[in-house]
UniProtKB/Swiss-Prot annotation:
Record gene name: rlmE
Lineage: Archaea, Methanobacteriati, Methanobacteriota, Stenosarchaea group, Methanomicrobia
Family matches, as HAMAP family: RNA_methyltr_E
Leading EC class: transferase
Keyword terms of this UniProt record: Cytoplasm, Methyltransferase, rRNA processing, S-adenosyl-L-methionine, Transferase
Protein name in the entry: Ribosomal RNA large subunit methyltransferase E
Organism: Methanocorpusculum labreanum (strain ATCC 43576 / DSM 4855 / Z)
Length: 203
């Protein structure tokens, strides 16, 4: 899928292919290029509604999937869905109970943007840090993280935090991202983890 595709073209293709949103192709593109999700991985999807990434994940892994969002997610067979804010400790406890072993965390979440560039960028960075902290507390050693972000102020500081926790970190643009957008994805592989955390070392 070339970058010359318009938003309407990709939207129509998503509808034809049965995906709930055009963002499905972003995860397909990322996994084809970086092999983030393996056949038996258990995956948590943060900001999962309407569920297009969960639809794609079902084709990539036979492992358990869990989608979390502030908005209800239309159910998918054999997929756990949790409605709530993943930054809320009570919701995090529910996720841990449902998913005791997690290989991959994906996050396509983005705050509602106001149009005030500095304010919006600060909120994006805050959400990214929350997702990174969540992944760090849940992933097993060697696990992977895919997280949407936007390049701007404080992005390099965020990237430095990710590099402290993963052995391999790349910043990429999906071929499905609209031309001119500052949207990017952080693809972080091989979570360093905590050598003293036996739960994270389990296969």
């Amino acid at each position: 899928m070339g970058s010359q595709w318009t938003k309407d073209n990709v939207y129509r293709k998503a509808m034809r292919d049965g995906y709930r949103a055009r963002s499905a192709y972003k995860l397909i593109d990322i996994n084809e290029r970086f092999n983030v999700i393996r056949q038996t991985d258990n995956v948590v999807d943060l900001g999962a509604a309407p569920g297009s990434w969960l639809q794609v994940l079902k084709t990539m892994t036979e492992g358990q999937l869990c989608g979390v969002d502030l908005n209800p997610i239309i159910p998918l067979e054999n997929v756990i869905t949790i409605t709530g804010d993943f930054t809320d400790p009570a919701i995090q406890a529910k996720i841990r109970e449902a998913m005791p072993l997690v290989n991959v965390v994906v996050c396509d979440a983005s705050p509602h943007l106001s149009g005030a560039k500095a304010y919006d960028q600060a909120r994006v960075m805050g959400l990214n840090e929350e997702a990174l902290n969540f992944a760090s507390n849940l992933l097993k050693q060697g696990g992977n993280l895919v997280m949407k972000s936007f390049q701007g102020s404080d992005f390099n500081e965020l990237l430095a935090l990710v590099k402290e926790k993963f052995y391999s970190v790349r910043v990429i643009r999906s071929t499905a991202t609209r031309r001119g957008s500052t949207e990017c994805y952080i693809v972080a592989k091989n979570f360093i983890g905590d050598a003293d955390d036996d739960r994270k070392k389990r296969e």
